[in-house]
């Protein structure tokens, strides 16, 4: 007679999954908002739209962390990639003026390492807490044979809300408007295939002091900055005409996504200093300047476009919220079919 088999024999440990859920409940609980009905663990999560909204529009976004995860595996650093995951989605929906309401995550692996997964999801909860977004559920998929031992993949899903009349579309952007840039916290979650290639080729001392007491390793793995609370504070007092979250495609490919077709963002490359991480990447990788601008954020994580008469006040308010803000340039009329973001 054949030996009796269990799900664990096939590589799926239900007890480990249950332990992970218990581990993360306290972290998720700290993220809760009054709109959330019920607790973690149901088949679906319930969220009501508050009565303060007259004509609410839901804004959704989904993203991952990309190959930055390969460095997390190689360096056994798992406590901040969850922040990256949240930031990539909530910063995206923020661009349209949405206040993030809730977030769900997908964690997939070949073999569930509970302490490691706990670190990851603790980071997700931290990102949610910092952005005022409720972590209302997720999926942990243990799939033997699908991923190498010690590796996993992440996906995140965010939903926010904005009054219909306050949706930011970029349509009102015109010549003379001011382009502001909010400083990034590093490379955020984009360009890591190139970063890894540069590290592999240059073989630097990752643990030597690199910038303001940080090692190069710390600079490379630093989590994506969350812009939610400062931007929402600015939206309470000022009209923001357009925003661009600087992700894959860098500055030159993301800013045009919010511009009317007849406009160009003319950005002065001297308006901010290229952070040391990007200086090193450019030199070590012999990366051309325009390739830098279309691959990395180059120190600018969020672009905000406002009327000229509001620029000083918006810059001051964001500064009071803890952001480093640069006046990058102006919006001008487009000439022919020129690219809609010019950095020079």
Swiss-Prot record:
It is an enzyme of class 6 (ligase). Keywords: ATP-binding, Cytoplasm, Ligase, Nucleotide-binding, Purine biosynthesis. Disulfide bonds: none annotated. Pathway: Purine metabolism; IMP biosynthesis via de novo pathway; 5-amino-1-(5-phospho-D-ribosyl)imidazole from N(2)-formyl-N(1)-(5-phospho-D-ribosyl)glycinamide: step 2/2. The keyword Cytoplasm applies. NCBIfam families: purM. This is Phosphoribosylformylglycinamidine cyclo-ligase. It comes from Neisseria meningitidis serogroup C / serotype 2a (strain ATCC 700532 / DSM 15464 / FAM18). The gene is purM.
């Amino acid at each position: 007679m054949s030996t009796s088999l269990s799900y664990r024999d096939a590589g799926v440990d239900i007890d480990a999954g249950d332990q992970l859920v218990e581990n993360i409940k306290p972290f998720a609980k700290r993220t809760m908002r009054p709109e959330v009905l019920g607790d973690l663990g149901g088949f679906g999560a319930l969220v009501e739209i508050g009565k303060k909204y007259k004509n609410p529009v839901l804004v959704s976004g989904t993203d991952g962390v990309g190959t930055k995860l390969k460095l997390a595996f190689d360096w056994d650093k798992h406590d901040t990639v969850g922040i990256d995951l949240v930031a990539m989605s909530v910063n995206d929906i923020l661009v349209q003026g949405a206040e993030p309401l809730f977030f769900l995550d997908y964690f997939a692996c070949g073999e569930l390492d509970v302490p490691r997964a706990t670190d990851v999801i603790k980071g997700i909860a931290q990102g949610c807490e910092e952005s005022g977004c409720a972590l209302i559920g997720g999926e942990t998929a243990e799939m033997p044979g699908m991923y190498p031992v010690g590796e996993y993949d992440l996906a995140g899903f965010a939903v926010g809300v904005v009054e219909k009349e306050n949706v930011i579309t970029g349509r009102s952007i015109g010549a003379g408007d001011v382009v502001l840039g909010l400083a990034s916290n590093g490379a955020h979650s984009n360009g890591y295939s190139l970063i890894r290639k540069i590290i592999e080729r240059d073989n630097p001392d990752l643990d030597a002091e690199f910038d303001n007491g940080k090692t190069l390793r710390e600079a490379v793995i630093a989590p994506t900055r969350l812009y939610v609370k400062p931007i929402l504070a600015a939206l309470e007092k000022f009209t923001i005409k357009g925003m661009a979250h600087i992700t894959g495609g860098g500055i030159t490919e993301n800013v045009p996504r919010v511009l009317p077709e007849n406009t160009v963002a003319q950005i002065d490359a001297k308006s901010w200093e290229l952070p040391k991480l990007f200086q090193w990447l450019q030199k070590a990788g012999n990366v051309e300047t325009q390739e830098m601008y279309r691959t990395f954020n180059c120190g600018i994580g969020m672009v905000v476009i406002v009327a000229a008469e509001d620029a000083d006040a918006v810059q001051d308010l964001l500064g009071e919220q803890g952001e480093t803000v640069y006046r990058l340039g102006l919006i001008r009329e487009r000439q022919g079919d020129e690219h809609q973001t010019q950095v020079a």
